[in-house]
């Protein structure tokens, strides 16, 4: 990950480095263009090694204009919100590693619902720490690139039991956290958001409170939404 000159708060996860398997997954499943920029990586990063030739920079990556390149990298998680905003403002192609909790960002959720970006290749990946130890974390790739081929999602051995939302006819499955019903309409989309998420452009069909927690606190709810007609 690059230097955090743009952020005054540094998280421990900012010093985690992506191992080769996750980069190989990106290379295998995404249609990567010829010109790639890895702005959060050094020449020793697995991104620059595997995606070679790829431009890389180790200074403050917020100073650069990435037009003409596809940005493929693992940004410091403490800066990912502003980094994602920068990429969207510049209108460039990108594929960035993001923590699972980033799906709760209202801007990201709306961009996914509009089909402008997608969250793909969810994995429980291993990252290297500066002290030589390793850490596992649930991440996904946030991208506006096309898929090269379909991703065969790992199957879970966990038995999935549906449960009904109180006072509702819609069902949710524990593992997939997806609303299901025989009358499930095309155009209804399940999304995760912070508890008080405002979805002004969408009609909320139903919701589940407190589906996910973060650092022991109940932070996220699950919504079933439909885009409002203008």
Language-model-detected regions and their locations in the chain:
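Class I S-adenosyl-L-methionine-dependent methyltransferase catalytic core
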Residues: 1-72, 76-230
